[in-house]
């Protein structure tokens, strides 16, 4: 025999089955109308239409998906004007006149390579950067001029001194001891004291001129425009340790100038002896 709980469960299931079949509103009205002469038209919540009943069976997602908003195009000129002159005050580029902003004007001059107008405006102002570059170029040109002037002056002094020494001994020595020759007899003649004095005077002149040239070169600033120095400077951009060898290279270049100084003078002496070797 079923217990009370089972009876309640069976009744509850029957009630739910009847409500699921519909007619819940009629049953509710019948219950509410018992003992009353006025019939109400109450509607059960089970019979009320739900929002889900109006949903379509299938929907295209492209119709409900949010469309991407187009990105606004960037105005580069407006951005530059706002960055360069947006906070410059009433007299700057914020008023729509970038030419009246001194900072913007300076930037434009720098991008254009500098011109006669600078930070001081259009009334005879000069660009400090272009003026500095022009000064550096003039300084380099002046240093090159000083170096060439020193070299040319010493070249003239060297040639005059060597030629004077050679001509003097050539005219004062009457025999063939001062002339080179392939004749064994002439080559066997011992040199006289005059021939030895020529080389002594030559060595003395070279020593004096070399010392004077080194002293004069130190007073002229070097521009470091040699190919070797430029190569070291470019290589130091990738290998910074090479920069410490640049002073040593400058000293070697200075010593090489002195060596070529003496070698050129010796070459001139050899040339002069070769010219008089045709004398018989």
Swiss-Prot record:
Q: Which Pfam families match?
A: GET2
Q: Where in the cell is it found?
A: Endoplasmic reticulum membrane; Golgi apparatus membrane
Residues on the Lumenal side?
Answer: 171-197, 279-280
What's its membrane topology? Multi-pass membrane protein
Alphabetical keyword list: Endoplasmic reticulum, ER-Golgi transport, Golgi apparatus, Membrane, Transmembrane, Transmembrane helix, Transport
What superkingdom heads the lineage? Eukaryota
Question: Which spans are transmembrane here?
Answer: 150-170, 198-217, 258-278
> Could you tell me which residue ranges are on the Cytoplasmic side of the membrane?
1-149, 218-257
Q: What is its main location?
A: endoplasmic reticulum
Output compositional bias ranges, type Polar residues: 31-43
Query: What GO biological process term is on the record, naming one?
Result: protein insertion into ER membrane
Q: Which GO terms describe its cellular component?
A: endoplasmic reticulum membrane; GET complex; Golgi membrane
Renumbered residue ranges of the record's region Disordered = 15-59
According to its UniProt entry, the function of this protein is described as:
Required for the post-translational delivery of tail-anchored (TA) proteins to the endoplasmic reticulum. Together with GET1, acts as a membrane receptor for soluble GET3, which recognizes and selectively binds the transmembrane domain of TA proteins in the cytosol. The GET complex cooperates with the HDEL receptor ERD2 to mediate the ATP-dependent retrieval of resident ER proteins that contain a C-terminal H-D-E-L retention signal from the Golgi to the ER.
Q: How does it assemble?
A: Component of the Golgi to ER traffic (GET) complex, which is composed of GET1, GET2 and GET3. Within the complex, GET1 and GET2 form a heterotetramer which is stabilized by phosphatidylinositol binding and which binds to the GET3 homodimer.
Q: Which family does it belong to?
A: Belongs to the GET2 family.
Query: Could you identify this protein by its name?
Result: Golgi to ER traffic protein 2
